[in-house]
Each structure stands twice: as structure tokens, then as C-alpha cells.
């Protein structure tokens, strides 16, 4: 997994730990009331541990989800039943976006593809004629 490579790559410095409520407010999940837990990192389902956050966005990872050691998981309402009781669920309808945003907080110097909302359809530009 790409996210896993980012986590073990020595060129990317983890700036954590962060308070869970800080992370959730930073990604606009303000209606949640979670404890003041410190989160050390964001990792994939397989390599995550206690005091880390992970994510589940597809049913094909349900077997990994059942075994995760993460304290928290970003997921949708549809997938929360795949997680063990030891992993607290954070419900979102934007799992991958929120995962990317939290990853950027932990690894601000990593290379990212920030969404460019200035991009236009080629038919709306001068390049159409070329």
C-alpha cells in the first residue's frame, strides 16, 4: 500500500502525536465528542497499532479490518461492523479525503497531489484547436 510506504519511509518525518479532537476538527468532523487521546500516527489496517488511526473504505479489506490493532478507524456506516471492539469507529462519508488530510497533518513535508480546482476542460481552453 502506498500509505504504508509513506509511514516507513525515513525521508518523511512524523510530526505527531496529535490530540484526536484536533485531528477531527482539522478535517471538519466537529460534531464528534471523543476523548483527549493522543494519536501517534496514521497507518494502514495491517500495520497500525494502539494509539494510531487507520481507515477502511472498501469491503475487500474486511479481513484486515477484523484484525487491526488501531485505536481508531475512519470508515463509513456500511463498514463499521468489520472492525473489532477495540477499535473505535469514526464515521465519515469522505473516508479517503479525510485519510489524506490527516496524513498531511502527520507528514506535512511529504509529496502530495493537492487538488487543483482551477483546471478547465480542454474544450474550454485555447488548446482545443491544437
Map each language-model feature to its residues:
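Domain-scale signature associated with acetyltransferase and cell-envelope carbohydrate enzymes
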Residues: 2-130
Amino acid at each position: 500500500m502506498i500509505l504504508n510506504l509513506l509511514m516507513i519511509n525515513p525521508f518523511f518525518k512524523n510530526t505527531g502525536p496529535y490530540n484526536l479532537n484536533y485531528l477531527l476538527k482539522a478535517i471538519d468532523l466537529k460534531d464528534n465528542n471523543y476523548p483527549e487521546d493522543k494519536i501517534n500516527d496514521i497507518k494502514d489496517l495491517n500495520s497500525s497499532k494502539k494509539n494510531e488511526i487507520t481507515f477502511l473504505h472498501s469491503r475487500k479489506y474486511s479481513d484486515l479490518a477484523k484484525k487491526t490493532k488501531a485505536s481508531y478507524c475512519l470508515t463509513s456506516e456500511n463498514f463499521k461492523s468489520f472492525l473489532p471492539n477495540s477499535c473505535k469507529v469514526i464515521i465519515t462519508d469522505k473516508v479517503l479525503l479525510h485519510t489524506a488530510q490527516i496524513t498531511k497533518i502527520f507528514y506535512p513535508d511529504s509529496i502530495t497531489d493537492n487538488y487543483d480546482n482551477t483546471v478547465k476542460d480542454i474544450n474550454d481552453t485555447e488548446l482545443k484547436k491544437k
